[in-house]
Design a protein with these regions (language model features):
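FIC/Doc superfamily catalytic core
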Residues: 1-179
Length: 179
């Protein structure tokens, strides 16, 4: 990609991020906004990849219709049929959890555990996490490349062993150090 494409994609992401934060901080319930808009966010995020011919438009039209496997992971995401049952349960959990921090950690983890799309689940999980964080007054948080291995190991442990403590502790440190 040329500099214009990179700049365009970065600015597009910033605009989406700004609109999400503005809506959530404006008093709207974060879980309702995410449930209503996350599919559109996904399509907006990946539209440039469709336009570039990297992925097919059908790949961003809805939940995946094939089984997906994660490279270098022992976790096998839910079947396509189970995804359709699990996503409403996730959004119900987010609606009923009063604590923004808990919504952020569980929302991110459960979304990536379900893995509803063929690609981009980690990015969408982090986007969902940030929407929940913003609803609690936390700053937008980036998982930097220098800790990506720790992040991936923590999410792998949570997904495979069912132990989310390391993942929650890692996210807590990242959010706390995000000034």
């Amino acid at each position: 990609p040329d500099c214009f494409t990179i700049s365009y994609n970065k600015n597009r992401g910033l605009i989406i991020q700004f609109n999400v934060k503005l809506t959530i901080l404006g008093g709207s319930k974060a879980s309702a906004i995410v449930e209503k808009d996350y599919r559109r966010w996904y399509q907006e995020m990946f539209a440039p990849s469709v336009m570039a011919g990297i992925i097919k438009i059908s790949d961003i039209a809805g939940y995946r219709s094939n089984q997906v496997y994660i490279r270098n992971s022992k976790h096998t995401p839910l079947s396509p049929e189970a995804v359709r049952d699990a996503m409403p349960v996730l959004f119900n959990l987010l609606k009923n959890e009063p604590d923004a921090w808990t919504r952020a950690v569980l929302g991110h983890f459960i979304f990536t555990f379900i893995h509803p799309y063929m690609d981009g689940n980690g990015r969408m999980g982090r986007f969902l996490m940030n929407a929940m964080l913003a609803s609690g007054g936390y700053r937008w948080t980036i998982i930097s490349k220098d800790i990506i291995d720790d992040y991936m190991a923590a999410i792998e442990k949570a997904s495979v062993d069912g132990d989310i403590r390391e993942f929650a502790t890692l996210l807590s440190g990242i959010v706390r150090n995000n000034k």
